[in-house]
């Protein structure tokens, strides 16, 4: 028994010493942060490259495959984006209206340390575009609409208090273009560039679309404005057309319309229907181009509806409602309205003809009476001479 007790005690001591030795060994292992960490702007209007070089390693760790933990954000953001990578660079889009900060450390995996993972200290860097011009000189009310998923149009207003000689230029870039491009079809107001009609944009969907609008003036520097869009989220479709309203029976009504023309697939639409029954209006939505509704009263005399469309959540995160379609209506008791429509003018004309006839008859009677009275006087004179 004493031998067994001694053996267990020895094993316990050995385990404690091994664990302590391993902890001591790991505590002594240190790894350096990556070198030459920087943010590089290749001129893509906000699509930046974060890049670095491997840290300096002791010879016994050179065969280890290390990873890097990268964190970055715009300076006014509360949340960091975190990336774990084995590469020496990472690219992402940023709002260049604000500053950017990033930090990175080295992760030495557990298999290289015979223990737990080892992290280096952080290497940090920041990036700002070169500031120029007062904030008030930036354009205002930038508005971009991707009409029918085919034609992109952007418009803006001039900055506050800018000199009359100020003019603006728009540049854009998205992944697939070799370099940023300038607008070739400006919308002009009083000779100044206040918008842009873009050319056909090939393969531009579901990726960041970067825009910069800067300006020039001989009187003052103009601060540029930067924007990032996802084009599928600013699509404004055409309104639906060929609406039909069918009253099936005393209660059921069928509303139907054609999907908007253009390249947008049928599965990508959601429709908003505004239905009016005798002055009472309600609104509903559907992803189909047909809907059945129930009349609130089978004695309702007028039913009307109109429809508009938008790209739904299956094809985009957001969208812009189209204009409303033309209104389509149904009216009950149409024979009564038809009779009233024709009866009133007919009655008016009949009364008018009757009055004219009476006047003519009265005039004719008066004329005959005058002629008869004249003839009677002539005959009286002839009797006297005889």
UniProtKB/Swiss-Prot annotation:
Subcellular location per the Swiss-Prot or TrEMBL entry: Cell membrane
Domain annotation Fibronectin type-III: ranges: 33-133, 138-234, 239-338
WSXWS motif (motif): residue ranges: 321-325
Residues spanning the membrane: 339-359
GO biological process: cytokine-mediated signaling pathway; positive regulation of cell population proliferation
Family under the similarity heading: Belongs to the type I cytokine receptor family. Type 5 subfamily.
Domain notes: The WSXWS motif appears to be necessary for proper protein folding and thereby efficient intracellular transport and cell-surface receptor binding. The cytoplasmic domain functions as an inhibitor of IL-4 or IL-13-dependent activation of the Jak-Stat pathway.
Protein name according to UniProt: Interleukin-13 receptor subunit alpha-2
Natural source organism: Canis lupus familiaris
